[in-house]
């Protein structure tokens, strides 16, 4: 294609503004929590239900931006169009008139994205360059990143980190070494080939000398670009300029995070973290709008704990107790299908996650899953040696921490059809109120099922 293809100037806002304004009016009427710019983030280990929350509130937003991470974790969304496991696509893709953006902080896996686009459009969802845009400054996750991820996990053996082997850590390592290719380079094939040749010489040294693996050829890489990179070219543009215009026109922007605070590279349980920043504070940088002010941070918390991967997990259940909760909550990884590690809600970790995210509002998800329990367990403190603490400890100490568990009465009834706070059983309300007090943040949303409408506004 011609140099600069996909970089057409913005000539007008492509949204159905009247429809959006009508949606906002409805939100105001029902007492929604709609602010100009909002981030929806995970408070714990990920898998909290961020996708279902983004899908719920996007009717009140103009733009949804994914600002970090890659295809290594999934967001499950259930709506009138079906059930979807999204890995790279922003969860606003199902809403008419919403522009979805993959920001510069994303690990752009063209291969996974193209397969995901095919899967979602096959279920009747329209995806065009009008409602999906890819930052020209997003870096490409290349085939060798996935190879290196698997090779390193194999080398580590029983000391592995539990990677999803999607190439995320090698990708971000290369990005910080300035050894990646930007998506915008797909618009300039001649320069792209030259850049890939330079990277190839360097990367093949690692593959062959460190891991004794097969090297790549430039022909293999160009074939990969032709098969996958070419397909996403129409979506690539200067999304920073688009977002600045949106901000100037007072459009509402929703920032969608991947994973949770406890997986954040700087604030999580290092080294059992992801390789990017999952905190809301990174949203302006990773989205391509560093001047953005975030008015609200909706932190998503599951009504119990779940975790995929290795590392300390203080409240973990095992055996039959764990399997019952896992089956009740369908706790299997959206990307890997791996059984998630599960246990009761961890107030210590959740309070820390709320603080890291500077959450202003909490969405508590999957409350309905706990309906089978006679007593609801809650980890209220940790025992470290001879002392107890309610402060989240330094990562190196976490492996020694033991949970101090207290119990509240269960409600033992199906609450999946409840839609108002007053109709929840008293025991369920007390459980929510207890969590709210202990973590120090208002719980404004309570979900009682995976469907879009299975939500209680407080």
How would you describe each model-predicted region?
Residues 31, 35-458:
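Non-transmembrane, aqueous-exposed alpha-helical and coiled segments at domain scale
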Residues 10, 18-34:
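Short, Lys/Arg-enriched N-terminal segments with co-localized hydrophobic residues
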């Amino acid at each position: 294609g011609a140099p600069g293809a996909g970089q057409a100037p913005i000539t007008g806002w492509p949204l159905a503004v009247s429809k959006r304004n009508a949606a906002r009016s409805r939100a105001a009427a029902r007492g929604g929590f709609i602010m100009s710019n909002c981030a929806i983030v995970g408070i714990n280990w990920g898998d909290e239900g961020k996708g279902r929350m983004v899908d719920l509130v996007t009717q009140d937003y103009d733009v949804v931006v994914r600002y970090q991470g890659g295809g290594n974790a999934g967001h499950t969304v259930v709506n009138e169009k079906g059930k979807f496991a999204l890995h790279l696509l922003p969860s606003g893709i199902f809403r008419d008139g919403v522009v979805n953006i993959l920001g510069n902080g994303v690990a752009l896996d063209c291969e996974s994205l193209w397969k995901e686009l095919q899967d979602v459009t096959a279920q009747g969802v329209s995806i065009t360059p009008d409602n999906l845009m890819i930052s020209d400054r997003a870096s490409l996750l290349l085939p060798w990143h996935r190879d290196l991820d698997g090779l390193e996990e194999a080398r580590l053996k029983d000391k592995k980190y539990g990677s999803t082997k999607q190439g995320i850590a090698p990708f971000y390592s290369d990005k910080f070494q300035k050894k990646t290719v930007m998506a915008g380079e797909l618009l300039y094939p001649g320069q792209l080939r030259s850049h890939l040749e330079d990277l190839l010489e360097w990367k093949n040294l690692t593959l062959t000398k460190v891991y004794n693996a097969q090297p790549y050829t430039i022909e293999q890489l160009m074939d990969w670009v032709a098969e996958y990179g070419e397909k996403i070219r129409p979506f690539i543009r200067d999304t920073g300029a688009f977002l600045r215009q949106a901000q100037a026109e007072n459009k509402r922007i929703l920032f969608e995070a991947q994973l949770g605070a406890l997986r954040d590279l700087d604030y999580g349980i290092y080294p059992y973290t992801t390789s990017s920043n999952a905190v809301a504070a990174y949203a302006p940088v990773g989205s391509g709008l560093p001047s953005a002010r975030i008015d609200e941070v909706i932190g998503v918390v599951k009504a119990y704990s779940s975790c995929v991967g290795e590392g300390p997990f203080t409240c973990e259940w095992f055996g039959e107790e764990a399997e019952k909760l896992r089956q009740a909550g369908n706790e299997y990884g959206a990307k890997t299908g791996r059984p998630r590690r599960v246990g009761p809600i961890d107030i210590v970790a959740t309070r820390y996650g709320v603080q890291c995210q500077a959450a202003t509002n909490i969405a508590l998800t999957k409350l309905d899953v706990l309906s089978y329990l006679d007593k609801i367990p809650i980890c209220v403190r940790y025992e470290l040696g001879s002392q107890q603490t309610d402060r989240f400890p330094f990562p190196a100490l976490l492996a020694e921490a033991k949970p101090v568990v207290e119990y509240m009465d269960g409600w033992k009834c199906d609450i999946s059809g409840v839609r108002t706070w007053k109709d929840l059983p008293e025991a369920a309300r007390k459980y929510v109120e207890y969590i709210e007090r202990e973590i120090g943040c208002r719980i404004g949303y309570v979900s009682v099922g995976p469907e879009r409408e299975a939500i209680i506004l407080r």
